[in-house]
């Protein structure tokens, strides 16, 4: 890792970077240049410039792990009204960025401003990586600080940094009338002279939600699509009330060439309690034909639930509308543009809406294709036994992504705690996200196999699916085991290896999937994860993640072989006026 390389190696990296950057004097602070000139003339200036570049080299190497890519869509078929509405939606989406910055850490705005005013190469590199990570901690390296000395707060910007879980629970026990507000997805917990208090998002982020709501209403006026109009107006109202129920249902009913997903959704950022949702936005252009081609799978959801390898008491009856949308991204903001870019999502998370209408699965087609070509296939070619690389397949990868999202809507939704029906998310708290991502991954593979059995996919897809699924886990574990998807992927790799479903060649470090054993191992893991969720067993969840959610020496060896392959992509959106760097 560059952060710990010998000085001589670091200087070689600096020389390479210097060659790429040219001799722009703006890259070196003026004061060191002056001092160097006084001491050694041009040679001193060059030495100072080299030292400055050398200091920035480790951060620049981290930045290079995120490949710049252009993501666009064909807008030629959009009516003028929808094209005009699209611009308003992009403007509204941009306002999710300042909210996310504060949700990630209260100190983010001030620190970013400080970095932006410092022209030194190291500060400029830190600023660029700060913008990728959306904060001063490296999400790919156990939240190691790179632009601050402060440790990463588990509660992000949602709670007082000195508040413990015990204090939170005691406050609720002493003030039971405040439980709903404190456990709400859409409140910030603050401390004042009287103690803790829950502040609604609508109040805490009014400075940005107010203008965003106005832009959504303007887009609603421009659009001629009735479902988009209804959703935009309902979501604008929700920004002022924190009641997202009606607008979540309206979002489920969207049938528009232009769509936006905007609001507080995922709780990954809250590593303290797993309660608080971050704001994000996806602005997309739909492909109705591709969506219709996949619509048949939503009709299988009840059958998939019944086919799960778990006791009937663990199975959940949900709404079955569950639309599937194939879209191309034209802009993202907030939590959707932080570090690793999601390739699909399954929303809303509100179990009340899911019980009534199911959940919508949205596949980001242009991003899925880009990641397979830039990252997924190259990883498979490095970590897999050569005899199995022929099974790497973009369509198998696409279906695993789809069925991952479908699987978020399957399995236990509620558990019983002290005689009360409780959302599994609340019962498992900080362990929920990693466990749920692991469940969706492995259950996704389980359900594609079921669709092969039902004749929806050809039998020839089986080996492609199993090998592509396994290789994809290495893509995810590179995100870091401090991140839910990465930790969930590590859990799966370790469980599959333990079951003999994958083996490592000690001489090459390459993995080989045992195509005869992996199906049983997949079913066993689905059963174990669902059992923990059904029982709401936080202790068992923590124990499972502690044992298996780590990078083993063999996995680390495989990851070390991926040098030069991007960890993820860094999107640029030309529709939003962004230009891909040369």
Label the predicted regions:
Residues 445-543, 547:
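Long, well-structured alpha-helical subdomains associated
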Residues 412-438:
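Post-HEXXH active-site segment of zinc metalloproteases
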């Amino acid at each position: 890792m560059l952060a710990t390389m010998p000085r001589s190696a670091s200087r070689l990296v600096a020389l390479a970077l210097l060659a790429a950057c040219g001799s722009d004097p703006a890259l070196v602070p003026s004061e060191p240049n002056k001092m160097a000139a006084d001491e050694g003339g041009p040679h001193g200036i060059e030495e100072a410039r080299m030292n400055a570049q050398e200091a920035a080299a480790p951060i620049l190497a981290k930045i290079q792990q995120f490949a710049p890519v252009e993501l666009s869509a064909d807008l030629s078929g959009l009516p003028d009204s929808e094209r005009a509405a699209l611009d308003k939606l992009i403007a509204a989406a941009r306002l999710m960025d300042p909210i996310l910055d504060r949700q990630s850490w209260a100190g983010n705005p001030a620190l970013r401003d400080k970095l932006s005013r410092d022209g030194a190469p190291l500060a400029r590199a830190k600023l660029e990586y700060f913008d990728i990570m959306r904060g001063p901690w490296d999400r790919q390296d156990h939240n190691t600080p790179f632009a601050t000395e402060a440790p990463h707060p588990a509660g992000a910007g949602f709670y007082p940094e000195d508040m413990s879980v015990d204090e939170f629970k005691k406050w609720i026990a002493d003030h039971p009338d405040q439980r709903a507000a404190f456990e709400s997805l859409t409140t910030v917990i603050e401390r004042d002279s009287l103690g803790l208090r829950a502040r609604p998002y609508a109040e805490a982020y009014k400075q940005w939600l107010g203008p965003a709501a106005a832009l959504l209403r303007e887009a609603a006026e421009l659009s001629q699509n009735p479902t988009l109009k209804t959703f935009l107006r309902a979501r604008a109202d929700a920004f002022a009330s924190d009641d997202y129920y009606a607008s979540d249902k309206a979002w489920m009913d969207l049938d528009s060439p232009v769509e936006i997903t905007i609001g507080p959704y995922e709780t990954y950022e809250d590593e303290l309690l797993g309660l608080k949702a971050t704001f994000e936005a996806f602005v997309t252009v739909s492909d109705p034909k591709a969506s219709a081609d996949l619509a048949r799978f939503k009709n299988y959801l009840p059958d998939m639930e019944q086919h799960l390898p778990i006791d009937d008491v663990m199975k959940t009856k949900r709404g079955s509308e569950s639309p599937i949308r194939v879209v191309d991204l034209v802009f993202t903001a907030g939590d959707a543009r932080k570090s690793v870019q999601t390739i699909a999502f399954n929303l809303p998370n509100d179990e009340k809406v899911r019980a009534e209408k199911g959940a919508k699965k949205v596949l980001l087609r242009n991003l899925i294709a880009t990641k397979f070509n830039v990252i997924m296939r190259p990883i498979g070619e490095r970590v897999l036994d050569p005899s199995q690389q022929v099974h790497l397949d973009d369509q198998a990868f696409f279906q695993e992504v789809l069925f991952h999202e479908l699987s978020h809507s399957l399995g236990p939704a509620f558990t019983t705690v002290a005689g009360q029906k409780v959302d599994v998310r609340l019962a498992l708290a900080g362990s929920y996200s990693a466990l749920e991502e692991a469940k969706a991954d492995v259950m996704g593979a389980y359900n594609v196999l079921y669709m092969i059995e039902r004749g929806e996919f050809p039998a020839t897809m089986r080996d492609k699916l199993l090998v592509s699924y396994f290789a994809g886990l290495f893509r995810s574990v590179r995100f870091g085991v401090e991140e839910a998807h990465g930790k969930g992927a590590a859990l799966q790799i370790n469980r599959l290896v333990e079951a003999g479903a994958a083996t490592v060649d000690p001489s090459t470090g390459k993995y080989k999937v045992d195509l005869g054993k992996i199906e049983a191992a997949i079913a066993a893991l689905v059963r174990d994860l669902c059992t923990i969720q059904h029982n709401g067993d936080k202790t068992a969840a923590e124990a499972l993640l502690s044992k298996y959610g780590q990078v083993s020496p063999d996995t680390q060896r495989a990851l070390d072989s991926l040098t030069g392959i991007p960890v993820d992509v860094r999107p640029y959106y030309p529709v939003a006026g962004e230009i891909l760097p040369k």
